[in-house]
UniProtKB/Swiss-Prot annotation:
Name of the protein in question: Tumor suppressor candidate gene 1 protein homolog
Region feature (Disordered): 1-49, 113-149, 174-205
Gene: Tusc1
Organism: Mus musculus (Mouse)
Biased composition range(s): Basic and acidic residues: 24-33, 196-205
Comp. bias (Gly residues): 13-23, 34-48
Length: 205
């Protein structure tokens, strides 16, 4: 009897120890799972992280969109300013062209206008003595650019040219010894015309 009870007691104690070890191992496993679950990020945590990431991404996109809008507005303002500057320069160019054409017309009308002014002065002063008007006209004719002065200059050059041709012809023929013929100096009259030799024909105009 005592042997059977002792064996049962031993079996019971062994079984109790085995059961206790299995219970402790189960509790340790659950504790590990619980600790792991508490230390990690669950599906709720992952969903919250994704939402924050989306919010940051949306904020970045909104900032980029606002920057693009500001750049477009600045570009539009610059284009408007350039268009205004272009219109102003176009008007300035037209004004300068008109002034240039006006100055060119004035330059073309200058001789005629001066003649008209002189005619107007002569008509406004009919009582002026004839000698003064004649002297004034003679003075205009004696100007370097007047037709009378140009004609006198042309005649003088023609005389010099003919004398040079005659001298060259005589030297080529050998009929003229050196220093035999002296060229008479050109003499100018009071009116500015040169005195022609009687043997040299007058130039035709």
């Amino acid at each position: 009897m005592w042997r059977m009870r002792g064996g049962a007691t031993r079996r019971g104690s062994c079984g109790g120890e085995g059961g206790g070890s299995r219970g402790e191992s189960g509790r340790l496993g659950r504790a590990r799972e619980g600790g792991g679950g508490g230390g990690g990020v669950g599906w709720r945590g992952r969903a919250g992280g994704a939402r924050r990431q989306l919010e940051e991404r949306f904020a970045d996109l909104a900032a980029s969109h606002l920057e693009a809008l500001r750049a477009r507005d600045e570009r539009d303002r610059q284009n408007a300013r350039l268009r205004e500057e272009n219109a102003r320069l176009r008007l300035e160019n037209r004004r300068l062209r008109r002034e240039n054409r006006s100055l060119f017309r004035q330059a073309l009308r200058l001789p005629g206008d001066s003649g008209e002014r002189e005619a107007a002065v002569e008509t406004l002063a009919p009582d002026e003595p004839a000698t003064n008007r004649k002297a004034r006209g003679h003075g205009r004719e004696e100007e370097p650019g007047s037709p009378r002065a140009l004609r006198a200059r042309l005649e003088k050059l023609e005389v010099m040219y003919r004398r040079a041709l005659l001298q060259l012809h005589l030297e080529q023929q050998g009929a003229r010894p050196p220093g035999a013929i002296e060229e008479p100096p050109l003499q100018e009259t009071a009116t500015g015309l040169c005195a022609h030799d009687p043997d040299v024909p007058r130039p035709w105009l």
